[in-house]
Amino acid sequence: ILRRKKKDVIKELPEKIETNIFIELGDEQKKIYVAELNKVKEAIEEALNDGGMSKVRFMILPLLTKLRQICIDPKIVYSDYTSGSNKIDRFLSVIEEVTNNGHKVLVFTSFRTALNLVKDKLDSIGIKSYQIDGSVSSKERQTRVDNFNNNDDVKVFLIMLKSGGTGLN
């Protein structure tokens, strides 16, 4: 297995350009977020009263994760949600702008459901993409990377953070 660390390939990478774009939640999305936040507060308060900090410690990460997912798109958590997401809409407009200017894009996420949602949206607007998540074999990962690098029609590569570097040479 070959593994390349950032320090080994940093000279080959283009200069990093970072742009922060702040996006307000849409009205429906905000309602869902606030309702979920109130549930989180109640659950933590109840757990503190029942079992103290030791009980709360195991609850916090899943609760915060759910809030993060709602900020991306409530559809990730609630499959029947249909009102859309300002964040996903803005993301898609950036992807369209970048790919229309002849560039390719790597997209990383921690959430497979977000990856699948974005893949579906890209497909619906005619932007070809490849995806790597835990379900893709090492051989297929390398094939997708090679195809992405050599096929100008494929503009976006969607990658799960946990599986992005695994099985790639």
Label each residue range with its predicted role:
Residues 1-9, 17:
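Conserved P-loop NTPase motor "coupling/switch" region that bridges the ATPase
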Residues 11-34, 48-168:
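Conserved Helicase C-terminal RecA-like lobe
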Residues 39-46:
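Cytochrome P450 catalytic domain signature, combining two hallmark sequence patches
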